[in-house]
Amino acid sequence: MRNAALELFNDRLPHKPYFSDDLHFGVRIAGKERAILAKYIQFNQPHAMFWLGFDVDRIGAAIDWSDRNAPAPTLTITNPENGHAHLLYALETSIRTAPDGKMKPLRYAAAVENALRKKLGADTGYSGLICKNPNHSHWKIAVWQPELYTLDWLADSLDLNAANDKEIVADYGLGRNCTLFDKTRKWAYRAIRHGWPE
């Protein structure tokens, strides 16, 4: 049976993703053909985010998004042993995370991501680099939302003001990019004014 969400996941994988079969031994890089066989895999490109990913560490994580009035994830990838899950939201338009990316859309995406993380009660320590690989038979996968999300569509069901309060986690997800920019730009402006790099 054809699974459009899984096909989309595979199409959007990096050419050489990080992967692991056992996170205790770290991650490695290989071609997509090898990495796609592993239990864990890098799901976003190095400089573009096609998916918002969340790690929810509680029993029933794959279904309690509904009880929390959160938008339906595109995919849930559940550990059958403990019920913990990764929830992935497919974006219609990728978010440019490279150094040349524009800050305004990045800040908006970070606010949406943080608000959704809070609504889902997702792990703030999750780096978002790799996820449970939905291609691997160890995990249970479910497709909930077949349509691709826009940030505005996600934002419609979230309180972005609450997401930008004192609880915002500066080193979580896209917030890392914004924090890095804010911390380095002041130094860079001063350095350029003082004639750096000459």
Model-derived segments and spans:
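Generic detector of well-ordered alpha-helical segments enriched in charged/polar residues
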Residues: 63, 110-113, 117, 181-189
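Short secondary-structure transition/capping segments
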Residues: 119-131, 167-172
